[in-house]
Amino acid sequence: KFVNITGGEPFVRRDLEDIVEVMFKKSDRIVISTSGWHTDRIIKMAEKFPNIGIRVSIEGLSQKNDDLRGREGSFDRAMRLLLTLKEMGVKDIGYGCTVSNKNSEDMLWLYKLSRELGMEFATAAFHNSYYFHKDDNEITNKDEVIGNFHKLIEELLKDNSPKSWYRAFFNLGLINYIRGNPRMLPCEAGTANFFIEPYGDVFPCNGLEERYWNLPRCQPHRYPPPPHLGPSALCRGPPAGSRRSGGC
């Protein structure tokens, strides 16, 4: 039903248009997550596929974003891209912020900016992932970050849109995660969604080491399945109709 093409940076691939063309034959909605740096390639993609979704990663206002992303001018470039896509008539556009120790206050301003621009805004908390070889991410100024998430939730609940209310609940889940508590909703990785990496290995999500299928070989890996998938996960193949990455 939904495909999210992510990275790294998807737009460094020269065959990305071919991938999108194939995916649109399989799914009604394709969204590409990007830093927004390769503006010419992104605009070209939107011209060819007007129904494409674009989500740009923005980690704060101008200086904060550029510092965290390590590229001077990346905030301005991302904003110009989003405004250009909006002028082109692309509907499925927005940006997201991964909240860390350094940018939770800017998250609130980014939300307000999204309201003014009429664009989607999403949040995440930075975390560790086997797939990306990261194990030292930890939010240490928890009171400050949680306080800013509470402010965001209050703003979302003022909106008349049920979608904003669901996002408020999602952000409540992020607060729960930051506090180190068990997740509020069951993990559906490997059942309602899964992650395919460039070499064809299929993971329940990109946060787990266990992979359970390889598309080119069309055979299961003989690794123990993640506990919540049960012993039959290796023999049933990828869940039908699920193509988006996600998970814990």
Task: Locate the predicted segments by residue.
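Conserved SAM/AdoMet-binding glycine-rich loop
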Residues: K1-G60
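Radical SAM enzyme [4Fe-4S]-AdoMet core and its adjacent flexible, acidic
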Residues: E21-V22, K26-D28, K48, I52-E59, ...
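Short, surface-exposed loop and linker segments with low hydrophobicity and enrichment for Pro/Ser/Thr
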Residues: I32-W37, N160-W165, R243-G246
